Amino acid sequence: MKIFHDFSHRAFIFCYISTMKKVFYLKTCDTCLKILKKFNLKDWELREIKINPITEEEVEQMHKLAGSYEAFFSKKSNQIKLRELDPKKLTEEDYKELILDHYTFLKRPVFMTDNEIFIGNDKKNLEALRSYFAD
């Protein structure tokens, strides 16, 4: 947290700038829980997405950071088979709508700050997370 002082007035004005730090996960996902245990998440908001669904604003923030909706769409969701979806035929708008419609369409876990996003459990992402937390 940073504190800025504005000396142009007689009184001090304190402005607090907080950094958004959120983790989106599923408590029934052993992989998510294993990854969460590896990091100090004291200052992070932990969001269990089944209980507290992702909002459209959060999906838009993810899109801005990731560059596409497909980047954080889980092609392993059981809903794909249940809904008889063909992921190859889905559009960016389809990905967005599906992620908002059902929590299992979000690739997990997602670590998101104001400027960075870490999506999923692949090796490259986990290395990037380790580097982020090491700084």
Sequence positions of predicted segments:
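Cationic, amphipathic, low-complexity segments that mediate targeting or membrane/lipid association
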Residues: 1-9
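Short, positively charged and aromatic/hydrophobic N-terminal segments
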Residues: 13-17
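Local sequence-structure signature of Cys/Sec-based thiol-disulfide redox active-site neighborhoods
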Residues: 20-41, 46-49
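Thiol/selenol-based redox catalytic cores and closely related redox-interacting motifs
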Residues: 52-129, 133-135
